[in-house]
């Protein structure tokens, strides 16, 4: 089943709605120029609140798959290793999503806990970036299923010459499908409740990422759109 990441979470209420809807990953943006930036102190409280709520629910309702603990992902743009490491520990995050000009060595420093966002203009550029940033220890056939269930190799977003995300552009799905046949990718780029099922059918990605497509306003989620997005994404049957 396709993984779903709700990004740009800024408050506990939105986080809990996303988790209750069946979201697999929650994303927190630690890039201050972003209108969805959230301070580490706030994220720490959100993560703690989600953990407490999920623990309480799973104690009451055994084996309820709609209330499993999501992965908590920190989104960074050209931050230092020290800054990222401190925030990871302080906020108790599971993974790092890197959106800037980080080097392959920088990505590999996190030993499988990080994945790189790429915004290629063409399939040729995508292939070049993939070879540059391919994880140092890709899954072998024996552990591929397990590894693919944890994190994607890349997040594929729409190209923009200056923006690091939230471009308002739709990613080239034909290019994305070519990449998704070879590597587990997270598809981003103007996904909404109305187009995510079509995108999954066309691309067959490891997962899908949404932020503005489920917002009431920048930094605040529309709860009904969150539920509709997750339902639409999870409703696509995968071979």
Where do the protein language model's features map onto the residues?
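Conserved N-terminal beta1-alpha1 strand-loop-helix module at the mouth
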Residues: 1-138, 148-239
């Amino acid at each position: 089943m396709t993984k779903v990441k709700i990004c740009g979470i800024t408050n506990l209420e939105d986080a809990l709605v996303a988790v209750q809807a069946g979201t697999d990953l929650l994303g927190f943006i630690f890039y201050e120029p972003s209108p969805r930036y959230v301070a580490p102190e706030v994220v720490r409280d959100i993560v703690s609140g989600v953990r407490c709520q999920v623990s309480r629910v799973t104690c009451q309702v055994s084996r309820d798959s709609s209330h499993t603990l999501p992965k908590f992902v920190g989104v960074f743009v050209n931050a230092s290793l020290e800054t990222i490491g401190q925030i990871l520990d302080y906020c108790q995050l599971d993974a790092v999503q890197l959106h800037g000009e980080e080097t392959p060595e920088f990505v590999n420093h996190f030993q499988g806990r990080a994945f790189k966002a790429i915004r290629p203009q063409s399939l040729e550029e995508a292939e070049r970036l993939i070879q540059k940033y391919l994880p140092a220890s890709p899954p072998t056939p024996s552990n591929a299923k397990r590894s693919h269930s944890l994190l994607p190799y890349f997040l594929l977003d729409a190209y923009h010459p200056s923006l690091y995300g939230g471009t308002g552009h739709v990613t080239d799905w034909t290019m994305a499908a070519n990449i998704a046949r070879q590597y587990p990718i997270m598809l981003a780029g103007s996904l909404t409740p109305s187009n995510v099922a079509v995108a999954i059918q066309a691309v067959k990605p490891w997962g899908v990422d949404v932020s503005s497509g489920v917002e009431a306003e920048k930094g605040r989620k529309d709860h009904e759109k969150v539920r509709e997005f997750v339902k639409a994404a999870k409703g696509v049957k995968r071979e």
